Structures are given as C-alpha cells and as structure tokens.
Regions:
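Conserved catalytic core of two-metal-ion nucleotidyltransferases
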Residues: 88-120
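Short, flexible turn/loop "capping" segments at secondary-structure junctions
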Residues: 8-13, 57-61, 106
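Short amphipathic alpha-helices in soluble, non-transmembrane regions
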Residues: 78-87
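Catalytic cores of NTP-dependent nucleotidyl/adenyl transfer enzymes across multiple folds
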Residues: 120-172
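Active-site nucleotide-donor binding segment shared across nucleotidyl transfer reactions
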Residues: 35-77
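Short histidine-centered catalytic/ligand-binding loop motif
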Residues: 14-24, 68-69, 127-132
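Helical scaffold of the NTase/Pol beta-like nucleotidyltransferase catalytic core
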Residues: 1-48
C-alpha cells in the first residue's frame, strides 16, 4: 500500500494487516500528541501511547493508538470540532462504556481514545500495554493471536473482538 504518511502509517477500512515494529512509531505518537495537546489545551490531562505500536518489537497494525485522559468523560464530546480540524472523525464509543473514539484519515493512521484520566479504562489500557512490554511470554501469545486473527477475521471489528478476551485477561 502506498502511503503519504512519513512514518509508513495507515490502513484502509476493513483491512487487517500487521507490520513489523518500526522504531519511529514512538516519534509519530509524540508528534501527534503535541498537535492534539496544542489544539485541545487544558482539557487534556495526559496523552499516552498504547496499543501494539507502543510495544517495542511487536508486530502491529500500522495505526498509532493514543489514550487521551480527561477529567470528565463528557469532555470527549466537546472535542469533536477541534479534533475535526486536526483531521479526526468522531466514531462514538463503539460500545465501550466511558470511552470516546476519534479516527484520523480515510486511510487510518491514528486512533485517539478519550477516557477519564486515572479511571478504569485508563488503568486497563495502560495495564495491558505495560504487561506486553514487560512479559515476553504474554507478548508472544498475543502476537500469535493477532497473526491468526489478521489472516482469518473478515472485518476489523471481528479482529478486534477476537482479541478482547485476551486483552481483558491480561490488563491488570
């Protein structure tokens, strides 16, 4: 796939493809986090890089996942216009409680997940990332699952749903 993203990021809708880990992904995250912090101002308490692109050595869909921590979940709704100016579409909660999701680009390069800073979603997402970073056995098991799902899942939603039990079991 040709991409205009300088970091080789981007995945078309409903495509399930894993890329080798790229050591430039943390820089891609940092640059985008700075753009978001500048645009949203003090409503953002913190932004963390999470998901597989935040785990050195782990193959991942070439989409940067960002966790944006706010004081109140309804603040996610107040971000819609500012995030649109940055190229993000609001995707609702996707059935996840206490969660707002924004995606950047038709060829998706970034996903921004807005949750309450320090809340259950915040702790769960970062707990899973930290477990993958620290535990090579869990990381290898997760990679095997991701590779199977990338090959077999008919949609991106099915790919994500196929990982949910593993993620929940390893988040805390």
């Amino acid at each position: 796939m040709a991409t205009r993203d300088p970091y080789g990021l981007g995945l078309e809708a409903e495509v399930n493809r894993l890329s080798d880990y790229d050591p430039l992904w943390p820089r891609a995250f940092a640059e985008e986090a700075d753009r978001i912090k500048t645009a949203l101002g003090p409503v953002v308490i913190a932004i963390e890089h999470y998901g597989s692109t935040a785990v050195p050595g782990l193959r991942a869909k070439p989409i940067i996942d960002m966790l944006i921590g706010v004081a109140e979940i309804d603040q996610g709704l107040s971000m819609i216009e500012s995030m649109a100016h940055l190229g993000y579409d609001y995707a609702g909660s996707q059935g996840i409680p206490e969660h707002h999701i924004f995606g950047r680009g038709a060829v998706r390069t970034h996903l921004a997940h807005v949750v309450v800073h320090g809340g259950a979603q915040w702790k769960s997402c970062l707990g899973f990332r930290d477990r993958l970073r620290a535990d090579p056995v869990t990381r290898a098991r997760y990679l095997a699952l991701k590779e199977q799902l990338a090959a077999e899942a008919p949609t991106r939603a099915a790919y994500t749903a196929g990982k949910s039990e593993f993620v929940l079991a390893n988040s805390g």
